[in-house]
Amino acid sequence: LALIWTALDVLRPRAPGLGKASRRLLLLLGLVFLTAMSGGFVAGLDAGMTYNTFPLMDGDLIPEGYLVYDPAWKSLFEDITTVQFNHRLLATLTGVAVIAGAVLLMRQTTDPIARRGLIVSKLLVITQYLLGIATLLSVVAISLATLHQATALLLMTALLFSAHAVRPSR
């Protein structure tokens, strides 16, 4: 991400920006990154091979067995049920936050590049959410799982692109 930011610095000179908008976009980027990291735990534990129903996890909103390890914090990293539930929850919060944030920020900026990045971010977060559901329901079809991971990178890049476009002047 730092390499992309530096490349954008070279390609696009600094224009008057909206400092708060840039910070908000970087916060959204951080949330997307956290969600992607939680997805790494899902992939690493093969957690997508279980609870292949949506939106409920085998009939429960909060699955039985959530945070069962002792100490409970270990469940966040080692328990398939907890890891998958947390990723679902983070993905939902991230989707809502990116869409709401993009809508609000589009009202604040007239920069065409930032606006394009925000539109792309909204489309990508919806695509990402749907790909996550499809991956889960398919019991982790590799093509869908790979596309889901690649879309996360595209989403982070689109948010970074928008944040760079509205960064404050030095």
Regions found by a protein language model. Name each.
Residues 1-170:
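Polytopic transmembrane helical bundles with strong interfacial aromatic enrichment
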